[in-house]
């Protein structure tokens, strides 16, 4: 199965004249629920986000952080308590129908009517959005997502991965300039995950702004050019992915040695060195304070013969855990 864009792009790469630079803007967004006990539960607290037009934007956070609440507000499934939200320059309060037409949402839940075929489901969805029959791209979209041969099969007969793709197809029937993917690869195998990644990249390259929530940090690191992290209803980080990855000023060097060692040599004692096995030596250092040349000079002074050397850097998972732990202890801050 191959996922590839068809002849017609889902959205032109350049926005119409006069359109704002940001595809989604939320300012001072708050959502408070009333618990059964009568106490107030704040799901979102003063959220400020600006998602650049044409970006592939990641929204991360632990369970209960507020990600789904934010998405449901943008999809107009949840009413915000206060603040403003605009999609493609359209205010949700002033022009709710126009704002709804500018966004496609792929929910995490596979809520598909089992008694309709994929073709029928897309035709119904297009009708709900007022897409004229002559402008509908039902078979093109199904083909793009590898579902053309299942267009007349009942949805209940589709596999979980096919249903996930069908949810993406439903969100694209009205050619929205903004696409929200809520955990799009949850429960799918590795091959399908890679195929969906490829299709998301193609949509984004064609001009669609993509907002992605995911629990797979590898997915966000692989796809997203900018990431916001939400914890306890607040934005605790919002930066380009590359900048976030530079936040942890830590690297590890692993040396594979030619001869066995009984302990860490004295010239390396000033580094955070650890003998992982008789011929495997690991050193931790901060690139901002220590140059790699200093370490190599110390290795030479210790008389070590190196067979191989690898460098390990912090990944998004390390940063995510550090930020959420810091925020939970009250030392974090909203970005």
Where are the predicted features?
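Conserved ABC ATPase signature
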Residues: 154-158
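Conserved catalytic motifs of ABC-family nucleotide-binding domains
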Residues: 175
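Conserved ABC ATPase "signature" region
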Residues: 123, 127-150
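Walker A (P-loop) phosphate-binding loop of ABC-type ATPase nucleotide-binding domains
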Residues: 62-66
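ABC transporter nucleotide-binding domain
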Residues: 197-286
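Catalytic Walker B motif of ABC-type/P-loop ATPase nucleotide-binding domains
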Residues: 179-182
């Amino acid at each position: 199965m191959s996922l590839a864009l068809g002849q017609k792009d889902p959205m032109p790469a350049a926005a119409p004249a006069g359109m704002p630079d940001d595809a989604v803007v939320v300012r001072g967004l708050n959502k408070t629920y009333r618990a059964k006990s009568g106490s107030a539960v704040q799901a979102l607290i003063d959220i400020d986000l600006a998602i650049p037009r044409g970006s592939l934007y990641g929204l991360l956070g632990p369970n209960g952080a507020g990600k789904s609440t934010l998405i449901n507000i943008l999809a107009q499934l949840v009413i915000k308590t206060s603040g403003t939200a605009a999609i493609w320059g359209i205010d949700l309060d002033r022009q709710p129908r126009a704002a709804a037409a500018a966004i496609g949402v792929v929910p995490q839940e596979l809520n598909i009517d089992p008694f309709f075929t994929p073709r029928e489901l897309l035709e119904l969805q297009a009708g709900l959005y007022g897409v004229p029959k002559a402008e509908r791209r039902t078979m093109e979209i199904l083909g793009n997502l590898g579902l053309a041969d299942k267009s007349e099969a009942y949805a209940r007969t589709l596999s979980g991965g096919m249903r996930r793709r069908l949810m993406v197809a439903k969100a694209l029937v009205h050619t929205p300039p903004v696409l929200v993917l809520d955990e799009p690869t949850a429960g799918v195998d590795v091959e399908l995950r890679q195929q969906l990644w490829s299709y998301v990249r193609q949509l984004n390259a064609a001009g669609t702004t993509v907002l992605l929530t995911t629990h797979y940090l590898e997915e966000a690191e692989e796809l997203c050019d900018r990431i916001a992290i939400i914890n306890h209803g607040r934005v605790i980080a919002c930066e380009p992915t590359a900048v976030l990855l530079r936040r942890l000023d830590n690297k590890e060097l692993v040396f594979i040695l030619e001869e066995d060692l009984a302990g860490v040599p004295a010239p390396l004692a000033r580094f955070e060195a650890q003998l992982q096995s008789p011929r495997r030596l690991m050193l931790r250092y901060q690139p901002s304070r220590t140059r790699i040349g200093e370490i190599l000079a110390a290795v030479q002074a210790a008389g070590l013969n190196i067979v191989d050397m690898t460098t390990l850097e912090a990944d998004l998972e390390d940063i995510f855990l550090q930020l959420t732990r810091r925020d939970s202890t009250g030392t974090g801050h909203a970005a």
